[in-house]
C-alpha cells in the first residue's frame, strides 16, 4: 500500500513537473507579428518580426493612428539603429516604392505591397549577392536563384 502510494505520488509529481516545465520561451518572449508604436507620436507601424528591445521612430504623416504616406521609419534594437525604411506607407505598412537598408549591409529597393516586396525590386545582400527582377509576396525566384524578404521559404514554396 505504501509502495503503491509512492509510485502514484511519483507519477503525479512527474506529470506536474512536465506540465510546469519551461518550454524554451516564455509567453512574453514568443515572437508574433503585430503593430509597434512610435513612443513620441503614437503612430503605429507594422512589425513583421518582433524582437526584444525594439523601438521605432516614424517621420511622416500619421493618419488615424497609422503611418500613412511618404515617410522614413527607423528601427532600433536596444537603442541602436539597425534598419531604415524610406518610402510610401499605407495604413502602417510599406506599400509602393521604398528603399530599405539594414546596418549589416543589406539593401532592398523596389515595389512593396502589404509590407512585402511585390513587383520589380533589387535585393543586395551583405555578401554582395544581387537578386533583381520580379518579386511576389516577398518571394524571388529566377532560374536557380531564390530569395525571401518578410516571407519564409515555406510561404514561397521553396521547400
Residue positions per predicted region:
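C-terminal segment of classical bacterial N-terminal signal peptides
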Residues: 17-25
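Bacterial N-terminal signal peptides that target proteins for export
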Residues: 1-13
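Glycine/tyrosine- and acidic-biased, solvent-exposed loop/turn segments at the edges of beta-strands
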Residues: 24-159
Amino acid at each position: 500500500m505504501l509502495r503503491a502510494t509512492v509510485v502514484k505520488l511519483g507519477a503525479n509529481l512527474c506529470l506536474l513537473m512536465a506540465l510546469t516545465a519551461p518550454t524554451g520561451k516564455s509567453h512574453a518572449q514568443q515572437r508574433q507579428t503585430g503593430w509597434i508604436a512610435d513612443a513620441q507620436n503614437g503612430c503605429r507601424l507594422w512589425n513583421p518580426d518582433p524582437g526584444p528591445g525594439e523601438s521605432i521612430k516614424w517621420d511622416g504623416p500619421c493618419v488615424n493612428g497609422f503611418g500613412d504616406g511618404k515617410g522614413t521609419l527607423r528601427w532600433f534594437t536596444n537603442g541602436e539603429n539597425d534598419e531604415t525604411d524610406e518610402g510610401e506607407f499605407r495604413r502602417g505598412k510599406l506599400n509602393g516604392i521604398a528603399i530599405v537598408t539594414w546596418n549589416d549591409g543589406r539593401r532592398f529597393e523596389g515595389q512593396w505591397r502589404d509590407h512585402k516586396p511585390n513587383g520589380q525590386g533589387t535585393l543586395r545582400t551583405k555578401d554582395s549577392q544581387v537578386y533583381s527582377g520580379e518579386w511576389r509576396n516577398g518571394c524571388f525566384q529566377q532560374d536557380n536563384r531564390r530569395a525571401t524578404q518578410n516571407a519564409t521559404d515555406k510561404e514561397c514554396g521553396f521547400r
